[in-house]
Amino acid sequence: MNNLFSTTKELISREEKEKLISQKGLCIWLTGLSGSGKTTIAKNVSYELHRKGYLTQVLDGDNIRLGINKNLSFNIEDRLENVRRTAEIAKLFIQNGIITICCLVSPTEEIRGLAKKIIGQKDFFEVFIDTSIEECEKR
C-alpha cells in the first residue's frame, strides 16, 4: 500500500505566514570553490539580517553532509542528490517566509539549475563567490 500523498494545500497560506513575520521567503544560493568564503559570508549576511529584524536560516553544505546527506559521496550523481535534498529543505523554509541562505560548492550549471527549478526562479538568487584558487588553497 502506498501511503504517500501529493502535496496538499496548507490551511495557512505562504502569504499569511509571510505577513505574520513581516518578510518574504527567498533563497540566496552562494556558490564557489571550496574555501572561497561561502560559509563565512552566509553567517555574516544572516547575522546582519537578524540585526535588522529578519528571520534567516543558513544551510551550509558541510553541515548538511554531516547529517542528512552523510550517505553521499562526491561523484556527480551524489552531488546532484546533495543539491536536490538541500534545495527541497530550503523550499520548506522559504514557503514559511524564512530567508534561506544556502552555501554549497554546486560546481556545474546543471546542478545549480536543479536547485533553481526546485526552489523556483522568483525565490532563487544565485551569488558566485569569486575567490582565486590560490587563495582557496591557502585556507
Predicted regions located by residue number:
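Glycine-rich phosphate-binding loop of ATP-dependent small-molecule kinases
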Residues: M1-C103, P107-F125, D130-E135
